[in-house]
Amino acid sequence: LIDNNARKRIQSQQSDGETVHHASVNLKRIPGLDDLSDKALLGFLKVVVEINRDKQVLAYRSGKRLQHEGHDFQLRMGFGLHAGWGMEAVGSLQKVDATYLSPHVNMSARMEAASRQFGVAVLMTESFFELMSNEAQSVCRRLDIVTVKGSAQPMPIYTYDTFQNQEFPELLAPKNTDLSLASLLKKQADNYTTREWTTDRDLLQLRGLATPAFNEKFKEGINAYLAANWAKARQLLEECDKMMEKSDRGGDGPSQTILGYMRNRA
């Protein structure tokens, strides 16, 4: 994994009498990687918005054949974001396999799978989170500190809250331009600034339930949980769950997951 202290270093350890070298790369030294990381998260969030705005998708979801007990079918997607090194195009001059070899590819897949467990649309590792701009980090939420299969290193995980049980306004091109809507959206992406996190209507509407009061209470609850003060953590996380009753899950997925973990180990 990426060094948490953001330094390039070589560690040596003795294994069966041999010296094994482990290298970590400081990705923060790559220019423009903060914007690239911001755009990666922003792109996935826009996908979440569009599956709740597109007329064809909405019509498909409301079809009677897919209804269950009178409720419309829900379409949900999960995304995992991680950053690290990888080897591309493995092979020889005669044949190249267009694939990637890296443990970091597997880490992204595990984050995507864990997004369902935590009931969130996006799950990020600390390695990815630390590459983003301060503005993007400020609107994300730390959920837990976990270890994943294949790694013994505990790491924080983060999400951007998405309230999907709502209608998003239709996108229309301004009347005073000859550009198509697709061209305008591409231009907007090319001209990205960190102001998007506090001005973009879709993003603000998407995280509408994650109020400052909710974020502060969840932060206090997760800190109590990590400090093994589970009685206090239960009280705070139960309150957080109630504050998210209007969400498509009928509560807060991360709070429910952690409450379930504590309940099974009480």
Labelled PLM ranges:
Residues 43, 47:
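Acidic, glycine-rich loop-and-strand cores that form catalytic or ligand-binding grooves
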Residues 49, 71, 76-77, 85-88, ...:
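Intrinsically disordered, glycine/charged-rich C-terminal tails and inter-domain linkers
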Residues 1-39, 49-103, 127-138, 151-158:
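Catalytic core of nucleotidyl cyclases, primarily class III adenylyl/guanylyl cyclases
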